[in-house]
Amino acid sequence: MNLGRTVRAAVARVVPDIPDDVLIFVNVHGLELTDDDLFSDRCALAPFASRVVLEITERIGLDTVGGPARVAMLRQCGYRIAVDDLGAGYAALGALATLEPEIVKLDMSLIRGLDLHATKRRVVGAIATLCRELGSRVIAEGVETQAELAAVRELGVDLIQGYLLARPARELAFVLTC
């Protein structure tokens, strides 16, 4: 819990320096859903909740921590929800039905070589279609080549993340140079 609180406090310190129309994505471990601080006005991110997307990876059974009810409470606080790493070993389609995320981030294992593998293309296309029907936007993680970019665009993915766009940067370096 302390690590999560520390991360949230660090993010909150830099939010005022980020343009108002930029969403801030913050990873939240499933166990953090048991931390009442996350749901309170005392949470460092509370003043910025409307700009924050909490990325949840289903690495533990969310039902064991009251996940769906807790996620509903986060929405009441103003946060948006993303299912992170969909397609990785633990992030299952059940998370889409249970959490009803505003955003779905496709794991890079589905994106790497997407342009070369017909089965991956069918899977990503089907997920993108399903997400659109459910009202979720889709982000492709790990886009590293122009060919992968062309493939995800063709398949209806909304946004990309990966080395093709930018390398990981410290705090605001990327945001402030775009």
Language model features: what each stretch is:
Residues 29-32, 55-63, 79-178:
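EAL-family c-di-GMP phosphodiesterase catalytic domain
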Residues 15-16, 46, 68-78, 125-132, ...:
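Surface-exposed amphipathic alpha-helices with a cationic face
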Residues 1-69, 79, 142:
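Catalytic core of bacterial c-di-GMP phosphodiesterases, primarily the EAL and HD-GYP domains
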Residues 49, 76, 101:
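Active-site acidic short loop of glycosyltransferases
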